[in-house]
């Protein structure tokens, strides 16, 4: 497979936005705005959440089909080592729901799985410094 196609190379690809279909796009965008610190930009029934510095953009649009039973992908949010629990507590206070912790299974990461107000799973992860792995 070629490294470049029409002058584009793989290292030029970035994440443009994480898109979510929502029962209530404005409400869900409000939750994620509080999590990320971004300011929502509504446009009709959809809401765009621009990327904060070093972050990612999100786009919320009305659900077009029934919600699938299994979520095929999810966000992993990374926080500095030692701050995961405080961030989890903050997000639960914003409306997330605690699901489970994974703290001992992997030496290079600990995470907590949460659900946003519409039930979409996401994780808050922390990686220990290299000398503690």
Tell where the protein language model's regions lie, with residue ranges.
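Conserved active-site tyrosine of GNAT-family acetyltransferases
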Residues: 28, 32, 91, 119
């Amino acid at each position: 497979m070629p490294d470049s196609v029409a002058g584009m190379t793989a290292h030029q690809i970035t994440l443009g936005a994480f898109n979510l279909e929502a029962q209530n796009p404005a409400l869900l965008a409000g939750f994620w705005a509080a999590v990320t610190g971004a300011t929502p930009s509504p446009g009709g029934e959809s809401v765009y959440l621009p990327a904060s510095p070093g972050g990612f953009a999100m786009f919320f649009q009305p659900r077009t089909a029934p919600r699938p039973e299994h979520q095929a992908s999810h966000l992993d949010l990374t926080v500095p080592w030692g701050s995961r629990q405080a961030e989890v507590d903050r997000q639960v206070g914003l409306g997330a729901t605690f699901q489970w912790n994974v703290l001992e299974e992997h030496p290079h990461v600990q995470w907590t799985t949460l659900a946003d107000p519409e039930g979409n799973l996401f994780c808050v992860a922390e990686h220990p410094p290299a000398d503690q792995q």
